[in-house]
Amino acid sequence: MANLDLIVRALRAQCPGLEILEHEPMRAHCSFRIGGPARALVRPASAEETAAVCRIVRDGGAQPLIIGNGTNLLITDGALERIVVQMGDNMAAVTQPDATHLSAGAGIPLARLAQAALGCGLAGLEFAHGIPGSLGGAVSMNAGAYGGEMKDGVGSARYLDGELRLCEAHGSAHDFGYRHSAFSDTDCVLLGSTLALTPGDPADIQARMRDLSERRRSRQPLDLPSAGSTFKRPVGGYAAALIDQAGLKGYTVGGAQVSEKHAGFVVNRGGATFDDVLRLMDDVRSAVLRTSGVELEPEVKIIRG
C-alpha cells in the first residue's frame, strides 16, 4: 500500500511552488456537497507541473485522482486516501489564436468559456453556458445539453498520455460518443482544448444563452446540491421519464431524494450521505428495471476511496 505521507513530502520537496491542501474536505469541491477529507488536494499551474505531480504520485505507488469542478462526482464521505489533482483556476487561461478558434485550459468553467466566446462574437458554446462543469471533464465525457455536445466544437485536445508524455489529439482520435471520449476511464490527463467555433451576432448568441438558462431554471432543481443528470440517457428514451413512470419522483433515502422537479436529478435535501445516494440510486435502478425492463447506467462518477 502506498505511503501517502511520503508522497506528500516528495511533492513539497520536488514541486516547491505547488499548492497543497492536506486533509482537505472534498464536500467543498463537489456539487453534491458530499465528501470526506482527502489525504491531499493539489493544484498544479502548468502542464509540466501536472506531469511532475502525477509522476511523483505514481512513483510512490498511488494513482492520482484527477478532478475539475467536481460537478459529476459522488465521493465517499469517509477518509479519501488519495492524492487529488484539481485542474482549477491555475489551469484556466483562455486565448483566441485566430478569428474562429478559442484555446483554453482544462480548468476553465464552461460558463466562463461560453462568456469568452460571446465576447469574441463566436457561436457554438451557447448550450454549455449552463453546464456547471469545467472544460477538461466536459471534453472527457463529451458533455452536452439541449442538442449540443462538446464534440461539435472541439478541434483538438492537449493531454498527458498514460506515460505522462505531452500529446495532442485531433479529429477522429477523440473517439467521441454519447458521454464518452478517448479520454474516458483512462490514465490520460486532459490539459486543455482548442475549440473551432462560428462567427455570430453577439446579440443572437446572448439571446440563445438566456433562453437556455431560463429553461434550465424552470425545469431543473438548481437550488439544491446535485451532480446534474444522475443516469445516462438509455437508448430510445429518457431516464427521467422512466423514473417518473416508476413513481419515484420525490422518493427519499435519508437526505437524498429523486427531485420532485426533475426525476433525472438526485438531490441533496440536507445532510445526505454517500450511502444515502448510493442506496437511492440502487433503488431507482431496480425499480426502473422492474417496471420498464431498462437497466439505467450511472452518469455520475462514483469515488469509493
Tell what function each PLM region has.
Residues A2, L6, R27, A45-E48, ...:
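Conserved active-site and cofactor/substrate-binding residues in soluble primary-metabolism enzymes
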Residues L21-E22, L73, L160-D282, S286-G305:
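Phosphate/pyrophosphate- and phosphate-bearing ligand-binding catalytic cores of soluble enzymes
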Residues G60, I67-N69, G153, L224-P225, ...:
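Short, basic and Ser/Thr-rich N-terminal targeting/leader segments
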